[in-house]
Amino acid sequence: MTQESSSSNHYVDESSFDNNNNNNNNGGEGSSNEILIRIPFLHDSVPALYAMFALASLFVLLATILSAHLIYKHLKYYTQPDHQRYIVRIVFMIPIYAIYSLLSLLLHNYQVYFALLRDCYEAYVLYMFFALCVSYGGGDKNLVTHFTSHPVMRLPMPLFFKFKPNEAFLQVCRMGMLQYVLVRPAVTLASAIFEIFGLYDEGSYAINRFYFYNAFIINVSVTVALYIVVLFYQAAAEELAPYKPLLKFTSIKIVVFFCFWQSIAISGMTNFGWIPTLDGWNSGEVSTGLQNFLICFEMFGVAILHQYAFPYELYRVRAFSAAPLIHRVEMGTVFKSVINSVSQKDMVKETVKSFKGTKITDGKTGLYSGLKDEVFNEFDIEEIEMGDFTSANDNNNFDDFDFSENNINSNNKDNNSSIYNDGASKKNHIGSAILAGGGGGGKKDNDLITDDDFFSLMNNDYANIDFSNFDQDALEEMNFDDDDDDMAFTARR
């Protein structure tokens, strides 16, 4: 780089670093203390900010294409709505975050208003991620049961004292996540209002500017939310393990937590005078533009990460493994899937649970009430006692199977006579067909062998078996020296 006149597009004025604080106050207007960066492959007359916008647009386009493809695949193979509705909402965060950051880079004077919409969806997605983890864990009552039986654990740093989860643990986690959902949009809305009256001042930590309070409040809120996420993951690790949650947690942390602390770090650099002016922008505007540019680039990386963190192939396998589902998934449920994923009924239920909580013990007695299975009317079956079976001819007549010889002979003879129905079965497979005492037409009666003989067959102990009950012709074909395992296996069957 070379130092030139103020009309040149690429120069460095060394005094810009010494007088940077003054530039913050006068907005950089009419000042020669500017730094322009030479961008490779671009003509010298192209301003650096235009080059940043061009590069950011490329990353945003790629990130949007990747995310749109993943969302479409999940909607096409929408076989598990309890999971995929949350996945679709989480993945949709990438285009929203990237596009709003790109618009903030282009229209930097209105970036605080774009940030309002972006931050609202960011808080919403964090809550959806928590709801997805609850769904992965089998629902509220399953997780509460798991937490109450969980051994004593140590809290994550910086708190290391021991902690025993109880029934209220899931509700505490929900409230910890919900506070961020409420605080982040509220503070961003307040920032937009203060910006209208000129009292926001992006990047300034003066106590008479709202940016200082904005950064402090959101920092506390996001730290609590992050701590709750880590604590929940630590307590529910066993339940979440089959879903490989590490990549999912990483993608959420990058978007929600890393991006926020990155903005705080850049603002701190501005406050210390480490961010110069650029193309007529003061250092505060440059820091905001740099943050938006980095987000555009980072969203492309997160979009790639989402391909592995939230793959659609698992649900595609589920679709093709069930014949009645193939036609429905392939032939036109994408629109219905969109409606289901957009509906916010589950969000309302989650919010109600945050205040109501989930109990698995009786509030009056304190006794365990157990998990209640969902009841589906189409599967209503009349309960019968163990050992009672309904007669095929009379629905109101119940026979005691254990003492009904007719039931034994009529219901068991087919199964007992052909344990192996293929012609290649070995001759020493013992079935009821070799029991002695034949009936008419060479058919064998189905008298049961004694318990002692049965367990002797299972243990390959032939010395204690009374072979007088077996058909002698069939026994001559048996080989008791070879293939003992097959005989024991047949006895077990």
UniProtKB/Swiss-Prot annotation:
<dbReference type="Pfam" id="PF03619">
    <property type="entry name" value="Solute_trans_a"/>
</dbReference>
<comment type="function">
    <text>Probable transporter.</text>
</comment>
<keyword id="KW-0325">Glycoprotein</keyword>
<feature type="transmembrane region" description="Helical">
    <location>
        <begin position="180"/>
        <end position="200"/>
    </location>
</feature>
<keyword id="KW-0813">Transport</keyword>
<feature type="transmembrane region" description="Helical">
    <location>
        <begin position="212"/>
        <end position="232"/>
    </location>
</feature>
<feature type="transmembrane region" description="Helical">
    <location>
        <begin position="46"/>
        <end position="66"/>
    </location>
</feature>
<dbReference type="GO" id="GO:0005886">
    <property type="term" value="C:plasma membrane"/>
</dbReference>
<dbReference type="InterPro" id="IPR005178">
    <property type="entry name" value="Ostalpha/TMEM184C"/>
</dbReference>
<protein>
    <recommendedName>
        <fullName>Transmembrane protein 184 homolog DDB_G0284525</fullName>
    </recommendedName>
</protein>
<keyword id="KW-0812">Transmembrane</keyword>
<dbReference type="GO" id="GO:0016020">
    <property type="term" value="C:membrane"/>
</dbReference>
<dbReference type="GO" id="GO:0022857">
    <property type="term" value="F:transmembrane transporter activity"/>
</dbReference>
<keyword id="KW-1003">Cell membrane</keyword>
<feature type="glycosylation site" description="N-linked (GlcNAc...) asparagine">
    <location>
        <position position="415"/>
    </location>
</feature>
<feature type="transmembrane region" description="Helical">
    <location>
        <begin position="119"/>
        <end position="139"/>
    </location>
</feature>
<keyword id="KW-1133">Transmembrane helix</keyword>
<comment type="similarity">
    <text>Belongs to the TMEM184 family.</text>
</comment>
<feature type="glycosylation site" description="N-linked (GlcNAc...) asparagine">
    <location>
        <position position="416"/>
    </location>
</feature>
<feature type="compositionally biased region" description="Polar residues">
    <location>
        <begin position="1"/>
        <end position="10"/>
    </location>
</feature>
<feature type="transmembrane region" description="Helical">
    <location>
        <begin position="87"/>
        <end position="107"/>
    </location>
</feature>
<keyword id="KW-0472">Membrane</keyword>
<feature type="region of interest" description="Disordered">
    <location>
        <begin position="1"/>
        <end position="25"/>
    </location>
</feature>
<feature type="transmembrane region" description="Helical">
    <location>
        <begin position="293"/>
        <end position="313"/>
    </location>
</feature>
<feature type="transmembrane region" description="Helical">
    <location>
        <begin position="254"/>
        <end position="274"/>
    </location>
</feature>
